[in-house]
Amino acid sequence: MDDSRLFERTVSSAIQYSGPVFDVYSDTVELCNKKTARRDYLKHRGAVAVVPLTDNGGVIIERQFRYPQQRVMAEIPAGKLEAFDTDPLDAAKRELKEEIGVTAKEFIPLGIYIPPPAILSERIYVYLARGLSYGNAHPDEDEFLDYRETPLCQLID
């Protein structure tokens, strides 16, 4: 299948905001019909997410307040890629250890999740972690969370 007719060519690009987590861009693109359109989007370095599977088939879930949603949310451990990260697997190992104090013998890549692709450039590398060992968590100083093992069947319902 030839997708070349679907591509858009960047005519101009301007950063509207630059921050520590993402940048906001406003680009002008040329469409396949030679008309132009504006594309506003967030450029993000990327992230990792880890599904920590316990020996008895549960998953360790963390809960933390998410300001944009204005509520406490249950999530799998995750974090953004840092500038020094050359391999997402290294970031996955780091985030698992920092957030819930866990190391794993095995990391299995599950794929790449692309959240709203029309407005966000972020790619989230997702891993399954098995063979867990437990230690002390060291979350970032602005991270306040708790975590607990949740049976997999409760996550599917």
Please identify what each model-predicted range represents.
Residues 44-47, 139-157:
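NUDIX/MutT-family hydrolases
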Residues 26-33, 116-135, 148:
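Active-site-adjacent beta-strand/loop module that shapes the phosphate/pyrophosphate-binding cleft
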Residues 12-49, 55-56:
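Acidic, metal-coordinating catalytic segment for phosphate/diphosphate chemistry
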Residues 61, 76-109, 127, 141-142, ...:
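The catalytic Nudix box helix
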Residues 5, 39, 49-94:
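Conserved Nudix-box catalytic region and its N-terminal flanking loop in Nudix hydrolases
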Residues 12-15, 111-116:
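Short, solvent-exposed loop/turn elements at beta->coil junctions and helix N-caps
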Residues 33, 54-56, 65, 130-134, ...:
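Short loop segments at secondary-structure junctions
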Residues 2-14:
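A short, amphipathic edge element
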